[in-house]
Curated annotation (Swiss-Prot):
Known partners and oligomeric status: PSII is composed of 1 copy each of membrane proteins PsbA, PsbB, PsbC, PsbD, PsbE, PsbF, PsbH, PsbI, PsbJ, PsbK, PsbL, PsbM, PsbT, PsbX, PsbY, PsbZ, Psb30/Ycf12, at least 3 peripheral proteins of the oxygen-evolving complex and a large number of cofactors. It forms dimeric complexes.
The keyword Nucleotide-binding is annotated on this UniProt entry: no
Domain of life, per lineage: Eukaryota
InterPro entries per record: PSII_PsbZ, PSII_PsbZ_sf
Protein's name according to its UniProt entry: Photosystem II reaction center protein Z
NCBIfam families xref list: PS_II_psbZ
Described purpose of this protein according to its UniProt entry: May control the interaction of photosystem II (PSII) cores with the light-harvesting antenna, regulates electron flow through the 2 photosystem reaction centers. PSII is a light-driven water plastoquinone oxidoreductase, using light energy to abstract electrons from H(2)O, generating a proton gradient subsequently used for ATP formation.
One Pfam family it belongs to: Ycf9
UniProt keyword terms in alphabetical order: Chloroplast, Membrane, Photosynthesis, Photosystem II, Plastid, Reaction center, Thylakoid, Transmembrane, Transmembrane helix
Lineage per the UniProt record: Eukaryota, Haptista, Haptophyta, Prymnesiophyceae, Isochrysidales
GO cellular component terms attached to this protein's record: chloroplast thylakoid membrane; photosystem II reaction center
Family per record: Belongs to the PsbZ family.
Length: 62
């Protein structure tokens, strides 16, 4: 059975990869920042939440 910690780690890796690819493309495309600003901030919030949750679940003894 897969625990919650590996799930958070996999999600963190996926979101990190998506942000590494998407943010430079959005910033480099003229006019795209105005349209995609909410998506970038939502992704940053999701990434931050995953970092915190991963740390919390890693610190809690099993």
């Amino acid at each position: 059975m897969v625990g919650i910690l590996p799930l958070f780690v996999v999600l963190l890796i996926i979101v990190s990869f998506a942000m590494v690819v998407a943010v430079p493309v959005i910033l480099a495309t003229p006019g795209e920042w105005e349209k995609s600003q909410g998506i970038v901030w939502s992704g940053a919030g999701l990434w931050s939440a995953l970092v915190i949750l991963t740390g919390v679940f890693n610190a809690v003894p099993a």
